[in-house]
C-alpha cells in the first residue's frame, strides 16, 4: 500500500514530534506543514535541534526555498496560512491532517481543514465534541464516515490502557488519578499573568503546581463502562519531559497485587504490546525519554492496601509516546477506508 500522505497544522512541540515520527516510518509520508508564525528557516532550526529528544540524526535537512523543506531528497511543502480553509491541500495531496495548533479543537473549527480539501482531521488534543480514540483501547470503534477525530490527551493515552486491563480483569468500582506531569509550553518561565488559572501562572521551573485535568473523566468517553467512575488531578513539576500516572482504584473482584501485576504483564506481551509496557526495574523518569509506548506500568512503584484497594503507577513520555499514537491512529483510520 502506498504511504498515507499527511499534513501538519501547527509546528509546536507535538507538531514537530509527529513530523519526526512520520519521517522515520514507511507507512506514512509527510507532505506539508502549515504554521503562520514560523518562517521556513526558523522551522528548520526548530525541527533540527530539540532540547529533549536531541538533534535530528536521520535525513539531511535543508531549505530548498521559502516554501519547501528538503529531508534528504524528500520535499515537504510549507504554508503560512492562519485560516486552514486557505491551505491548498490538493496541491500537496495531504489527505490526513494533524491539527496540532491547540486552537481548532472542536468539530466546527477543525472542519475548516475539510473545506480546504482535507479528507480527515486528527486533533492532537482532547475535544469537547469530536469523537476521541485511544489506540489499543477503542480505535476499532472508528468508522469511515467520521471525518474529524481526537487522539485524546497524552495522559488519557497513558491511563486508558491500564484502566482497561484492570476493569476487564477485576472490575473498577471507582478510582482517582493523579498525574505528575512535566512542564508544557503553556506554562510560565517566571511568575506571570494567568487569569483563568492563578497557580498556573507561577514559575514552572521551580514550583510544584497543582492543576486540573480532564484526562481521567475522558477515559469514560473511550471506555463507557467507566463513565463516572474516575476523576483526577495533575501536579505540574519542573521536568521537561516524561510524566507518571498514579491510579488508585477500588476493585469489584478481590485480587492480590501479584495477580494484578501478572495480568498487566500478560496484556503488555499480548494484545497491548507496543502500547502498554511493563517493568520491574528501578526506573526513574529520564529512563523513558523517547519511549514510544503509551503507558509503562512500574511494578515496583505500586502498592496495595488490601485485595480491593490498590495504587498503580505507570510512566509515559508525554511528547514522543503521544506523537507516535497520533501516527498510529492515522494508519488505523486509513485501513478502515
UniProtKB/Swiss-Prot annotation:
The keyword Mitochondrion does not apply. Plants contain two types of GAPDH: cytosolic forms which participate in glycolysis and chloroplast forms which participate in photosynthesis. All the forms are encoded by distinct genes. GO terms for biological process: glucose metabolic process; glycolytic process. D-glyceraldehyde 3-phosphate binds at residues 153-155, 184, 213-214, 236. Disulfide bonds: none annotated. It comes from Antirrhinum majus (Garden snapdragon). One of its GO terms (cellular component) is cytosol. Keywords: Cytoplasm, Glycolysis, NAD, Oxidoreductase. This is Glyceraldehyde-3-phosphate dehydrogenase, cytosolic. InterPro entries: GlycerAld/Erythrose_P_DH, GlycerAld_3-P_DH_AS, GlycerAld_3-P_DH_cat, GlycerAld_3-P_DH_NAD(P)-bd, Glyceraldehyde-3-P_DH_1, NAD(P)-bd_dom_sf.
Amino acid at each position: 500500500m502506498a504511504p498515507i500522505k499527511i499534513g501538519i497544522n501547527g509546528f509546536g512541540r507535538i507538531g514537530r514530534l509527529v513530523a519526526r515520527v512520520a519521517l522515520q516510518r514507511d507507512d506514512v509520508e509527510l507532505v506539508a506543514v502549515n504554521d503562520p508564525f514560523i518562517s521556513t528557516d526558523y522551522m528548520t532550526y526548530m525541527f533540527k535541534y530539540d532540547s529533549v529528544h536531541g538533534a535530528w540524526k536521520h535525513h539531511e535537512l535543508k531549505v530548498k526555498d521559502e516554501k519547501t523543506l528538503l529531508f534528504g531528497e524528500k520535499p515537504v511543502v510549507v504554508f503560512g496560512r492562519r485560516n486552514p480553509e486557505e491551505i491548498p491541500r490538493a496541491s500537496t495531496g495531504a489527505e490526513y491532517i494533524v491539527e496540532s495548533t491547540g486552537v481548532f479543537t472542536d468539530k466546527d473549527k477543525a472542519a475548516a481543514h475539510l473545506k480546504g480539501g482535507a479528507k480527515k482531521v486528527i486533533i492532537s488534543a482532547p475535544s469537547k465534541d469530536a469523537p476521541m480514540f485511544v489506540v489499543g483501547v477503542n480505535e476499532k470503534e472508528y468508522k469511515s464516515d467520521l471525518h474529524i477525530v481526537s487522539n485524546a490527551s497524552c495522559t488519557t493515552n497513558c491511563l486508558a490502557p491500564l484502566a482497561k486491563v484492570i476493569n476487564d480483569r477485576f472490575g473498577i468500582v471507582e478510582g482517582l488519578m493523579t498525574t505528575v506531569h512535566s512542564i508544557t509550553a503553556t506554562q510560565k518561565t517566571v511568575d506571570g499573568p494567568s487569569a483563568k488559572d492563578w497557580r498556573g501562572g507561577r514559575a514552572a521551573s521551580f514550583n510544584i503546581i497543582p492543576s486540573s485535568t480532564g484526562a481521567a473523566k475522558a477515559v469514560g468517553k473511550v471506555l463507557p463502562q467507566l463513565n463516572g467512575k474516575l476523576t483526577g488531578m495533575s501536579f505540574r513539576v519542573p521536568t521537561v519531559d516524561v510524566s507518571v500516572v498514579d491510579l488508585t482504584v477500588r476493585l469489584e473482584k478481590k485480587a492480590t497485587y501479584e495477580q494484578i501485576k501478572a495480568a498487566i504483564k500478560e496484556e503488555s506481551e499480548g494484545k497491548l504490546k507496543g502500547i502498554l509496557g511493563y517493568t520491574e526495574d528501578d526506573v526513574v523518569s529520564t529512563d523513558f525519554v523517547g519511549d514510544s509506548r503509551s503507558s509503562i506500568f512500574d511494578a515496583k512503584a505500586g502498592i496495595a492496601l488490601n485485595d480491593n484497594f490498590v495504587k498503580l503507577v505507570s510512566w509515559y513520555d508525554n511528547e514522543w509516546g503521544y506523537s507516535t499514537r497520533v501516527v498510529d491512529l492515522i494508519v488505523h483510520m486509513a485501513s478502515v477506508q
